[in-house]
């Protein structure tokens, strides 16, 4: 039976199914509260990738749910951004609180000035990027970066914590 996996922090070699993330986070004393969720850049930012994330956002919005953490989406190109805007996907993502960034590398390569976390402060982020080594995204070596699919990132943004299992837990 297949189950979505989350990898990290600091390496893609630390993979576990979403059902094991809570135990792993507690056992390793990772900060359980997610400080930010990010989708896109060049990886996992195609029309299809963002469309799957937008579908989950649309369903969540039907029930009045919002992301519990800052959620940033970076379309892979201007063509992708224009197409997801045309087809209503941007509206779906924004309806749960997402901010759509410019079509650029941005946080994936460390071009992210964070005011919410002090340098050296341990925190957890979740992204659909393909890199998660220390200081990669925000210049803070204490940021623990976990990687998942765009759909998993949306699920965790809605839950707000690493111990939220979007396959079995409920939101109100």
Model-assigned labels for residue ranges:
Residues 1-172:
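Fe-S-dependent hydro-lyases/dehydratases of central metabolism
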């Amino acid at each position: 039976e297949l189950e979505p996996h989350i990898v990290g922090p600091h390496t893609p070699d630390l993979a576990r199914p979403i059902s094991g993330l809570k135990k792993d986070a507690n056992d390793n004393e990772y900060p359980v509260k997610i400080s930010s969720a990010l989708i896109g850049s060049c990886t996992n930012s195609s029309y299809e990738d963002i469309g799957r994330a937008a579908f989950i956002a649309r369903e969540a919005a039907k029930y009045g749910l919002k992301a519990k953490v800052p959620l940033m989406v970076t379309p892979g190109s201007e063509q992708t951004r224009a197409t997801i805007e045309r087809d209503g996907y941007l509206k779906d993502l924004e309806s749960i609180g997402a901010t759509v960034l410019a079509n650029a590398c941005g946080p994936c390569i460390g071009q992210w000035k964070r005011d919410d976390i002090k340098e050296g402060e341990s925190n957890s982020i979740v992204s659909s990027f393909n890199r998660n080594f220390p200081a990669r995204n925000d210049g803070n070596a204490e940021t623990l970066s976990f990687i998942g699919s765009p759909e998993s990132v949306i699920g965790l943004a809605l839950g707000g914590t690493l111990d939220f299992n979007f396959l079995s837990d409920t939101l109100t």
